[in-house]
């Protein structure tokens, strides 16, 4: 969010070993880069074909928020009115969302690192303006 990631959170890759396949971490920071006094992210494996990411943000005043989702270079993206379809070959993931404030999505060029190489990729941006913000993204594997 706003240029800060959850990579600094302890246990980022250990969630699968936690009870009931839930990961919950909280991070607070008053730096200018973050612009957030509190950001909590929770990852839940809702079913064998669905992951839900829940974000809660609390700010002292309303601000512009941006969440980035970096995509693999082989993923094709279709932005639709109420969903986003991510396709790689015959595999398709449908992304839906619920938010307590209006959000907008856009796609931009980006980079990712695979096998020690920098590759061109794309990024999904979710933007909102709020002091208090709740977001749930549902990542559903279709086939």
Language-model region placement:
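CBM-like, beta-strand-rich accessory domains located in the C-terminal region of large
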Residues: 1-143
């Amino acid at each position: 969010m706003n240029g800060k990631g959850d990579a600094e959170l302890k246990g980022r890759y250990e969630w699968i070993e936690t009870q009931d396949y839930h990961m919950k971490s909280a991070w607070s920071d008053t730096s200018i880069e973050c612009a957030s006094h509190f950001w909590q992210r929770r990852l839940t494996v809702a079913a064998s074909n669905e992951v839900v990411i829940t974000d809660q943000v609390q700010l002292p005043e309303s601000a512009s928020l941006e969440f980035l989702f970096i995509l693999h270079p082989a993923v094709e993206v279709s932005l639709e009115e109420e969903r986003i379809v991510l396709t790689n070959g015959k595999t398709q993931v449908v992304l839906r969302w619920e938010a307590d404030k209006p959000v907008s999505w856009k796609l931009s060029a980006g980079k990712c690192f695979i096998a020690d190489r920098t590759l061109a990729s794309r990024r999904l941006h979710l933007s909102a303006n709020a002091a208090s913000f709740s977001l749930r993204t549902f990542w559903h594997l279709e086939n």
